[in-house]
Design a protein with these regions (language model features):
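Short beta-strand His + acidic residue motifs that chelate non-heme Fe in jelly-roll/DSBH
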Residues: 20, 44, 64-65, 85, ...
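ATP/adenylate-binding site constellation spanning eukaryotic-like Ser/Thr protein kinases
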Residues: 25, 59, 98
Length: 121
């Protein structure tokens, strides 16, 4: 059973000028740019009740730990990888190198004043 979905970019175009990479299209409510230093840990096995997250690794390397119920999984992602974490899947990031990534959400995790779709219970 895979708790997450490994994805790919919608398209990539590269020529002598550089690269265009379409990470996602459609309904995106929130976009985050994240830089984490080697050895950093983020997430603390939080989860979202409603939001679905998609990540694109711009550069670097990270280990993703996920669990739901009795199922636990680990993945390593590097530059160019895309992955999606569905609602209710707990997740934690361990950065194996300095890493840049973009995360998109299908709905905002900040749902109102002092309200968030981020849980650690």
């Amino acid at each position: 059973m895979n708790l997450i979905e490994k994805g790919k970019t919608d398209f990539e175009f590269e020529d002598e000028r550089g690269l265009i990479c379409q990470i996602s299209h459609g309904d995106i409510a929130q976009v985050n740019y994240v830089f984490s230093k080697k050895g950093a840990v983020r997430g603390k096995f939080h989860y979202h009740k409603r939001a679905k997250e998609q990540f694109y690794v711009i550069s670097g390397k990270l280990k993703l730990e996920v669990f739901k119920g009795d199922t636990r999984e680990e993945y390593v992602f590097t530059t160019g990888n895309v992955f999606l974490i569905p609602p209710l899947v707990r997740h934690n990031f361990i950065y194996l190198e300095d890493t840049l990534l973009v995360s998109t959400y299908d709905r905002c995790v900040e749902t109102g004043e002092n309200e968030k779709d981020i849980f650690n219970d």
